[in-house]
Design a protein with these regions (language model features):
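Divalent metal-coordination and catalytic microenvironments
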Residues: 44, 60, 65, 89, ...
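Extracellular/periplasmic ectodomains of large secreted or surface enzymes and adhesion receptors
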Residues: 24-28, 447-485
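Acidic, glycine-enriched loop/beta-strand segments at the rims
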Residues: 29, 46-59, 72-73, 373-376, ...
Length: 485
């Protein structure tokens, strides 16, 4: 990591703000003119995420939805009347992106379930998200309401209803569905299990013609290598463990995931480098969702999972349903501890192999489900990636600039630079030293709206009340004891 203190000077213009006391105008304008919707992060350490470096003692000025100035504190003036955020000893990085979550019913209002998910995401520093499932009408409605400024939440990209063996019957219907979903305004397609090869190929061909990315699961009929050749982005490492088995092993035909069973003993990790290199060459993105699978196979047991502090923000009915689901999945929960460990370790090895080969990773939580609470689950996934051997910068990259690049928006957000959308995360400690520091949040800015620690705590409290949780004494975002700055 390089530590830098200088940067090309830019004009100190201002940027957007969501807090009381907006400022006055930039000095280049008449002093009497107000610098409306302007906020300056003063004397802050910037983690720009354009490379592995740290810019010490910077001032970052934001106006509207954009960063308009970034430079050394002694050379970057703060517009007169701009709202100032103290940055000394703090770290400013791009907001996080959850590239695999599910929306729930609602319109995005604070009192409904969808609104609660939005609040939990923001309170944990997630300013962009990709929804890969949820009620058909909810996803586009909430996405558009956020975009219009009617409700506050991360910028959303939403997938169409999943294409699978029950929703499409044959190649022609697959093509028709793709055209329908494009016309309906969905941002991408999701594929699930049980698609035959011919139907899959028709879907992928039409998706390319319509300019829609496809993400999702890998079925035995399709296979990992054909999915890679087709350009599908892969969720959950689907198909990778299957490919670690000997060529003639019947367990290769299990749908997407070889679970915690006897076939694990026959897997050959020596196959991982070739799989990773094939992924890199194909330019395919992967969202491993390590934390979800490690939660499901956790040796600590369901009762321990029920003590997670973030469950305060989940409805008790959801917690009970998750408990029952794990209790009913005997293969996952009753497997020997050694087999669970091997399952988790093989997934870590595949993920580490992908990173080492230069294949692109994304952070995806697959929340809210199975003790994975929206927002909080992003931090669990980042920490799981770190535990898999991905260095801090690589994890942060997967959670920021990689997501923007995957969506074709690398010049819009995902880094801290002049002209970028002001989706920012202000931290109390350096995330390049430990990704756990992304939990220690002093404030979040989403599209130029500033949410200080006090407002994030208020959002969490409102969510907890709706979830019928008891009041909390110590406030914080991703830990139960972090305090407001």
């Amino acid at each position: 990591m390089r530590r830098e203190t200088r940067r090309p000077r830019g004009m100190a213009l201002g940027l957007a703000l969501w807090m009381t006391g907006c400022g006055m105008a930039h000095p280049s304008v008449k002093a009497e003119a107000p610098a409306k919707d302007t906020v300056a992060f003063v004397d802050v350490n910037v983690v720009p995420m354009d490379s592995e470096r740290l810019l010490a003692h910077q001032t970052v000025v934001v106006r509207g939805e954009r960063i308009v100035a970034l430079g050394p504190v002694d050379a970057t003036p703060v517009p007169v009347g701009a709202a100032r955020v103290e940055g000394r000893g703090r770290y400013l990085m791009p907001g996080l992106a959850d590239m695999h979550l599910h929306l729930v019913p609602g319109t995005g209002q604070p009192e409904d379930p969808a609104g609660q998910v939005l609040a939990l995401l923001l309170a944990n520093g997630v300013t962009s998200a990709r929804a890969l499932g949820g009620p058909k009408d909810t996803s586009r409605l909430v996405r558009d309401r956020v975009a219009r400024g009617e409700v506050l939440g991360p910028t959303l990209r939403v997938a169409a209803p999943s294409l699978h063996g029950k929703s499409v019957q044959g190649p022609e219907q697959a093509r028709q569905r793709v055209r329908e979903y494009k016309a309906a305004g969905y941002d991408l397609l999701k594929t699930h299990g049980s698609l035959g090869r011919e139907t899959y190929d028709a879907m992928m061909s039409e998706a390319r013609a319509q300019g829609l990315a496809v993400s999702g699961h890998v079925t035995p009929d399709v296979g990992l290598f054909h999915a890679l050749e087709s350009g599908q982005q892969i969720e959950h490492l689907d198909g990778y463990l299957n490919e670690l088995l000997p060529e003639n092993d019947s367990a290769r035909q299990e749908v997407g995931q070889v679970e915690v069973g006897e076939p694990l003993e026959r897997m050959e990790p020596a196959r991982i480098p070739a799989l990773a290199e094939a992924t890199r060459k194909a330019g395919v993105w992967s969202s491993p969702t390590l934390a979800l699978f490690e939660t499901v196979t956790s040796p600590e047991g369901v009762e321990s999972l029920r003590t997670r502090p973030e469950l305060r923000y989940a409805k008790q009915a959801s917690v009970e349903a998750w408990t029952q689901m794990l209790a009913n999945d005997s293969q996952m929960t009753s497997a020997p501890a050694g087999r669970k460990h091997r399952f988790a370790e093989l997934r870590r090895q595949v993920t580490r192999g992908l990173y080492t080969a230069g294949a692109k990773l994304l952070v995806g939580s697959d929340s809210p489900q199975l003790f994975m609470v929206a927002g909080f689950a992003v931090h669990r996934e980042m920490e799981a990636l770190a535990a898999a051997g991905i260095p801090p910068y690589g994890v942060l990259e997967a959670a920021t600039r990689n997501a923007a690049e995957y969506l074709g928006e690398a010049g819009t957000w995902g880094t801290v630079a002049e002209g970028r959308r002001a989706d920012l995360l202000l931290l109390e400690a350096n995330p390049l030293e430990d990704v756990k520091h992304t939990r220690d949040i002093a404030g979040v800015m989403v599209r130029g709206q500033w949410l200080p620690r006090s407002e994030l705590d208020a959002m969490l409290e409102r969510t907890a009340v709706v979830a019928n949780a008891p009041p909390r004494v110590n406030k914080g975002v991703a830990t139960a004891t972090s305090a407001a700055p």
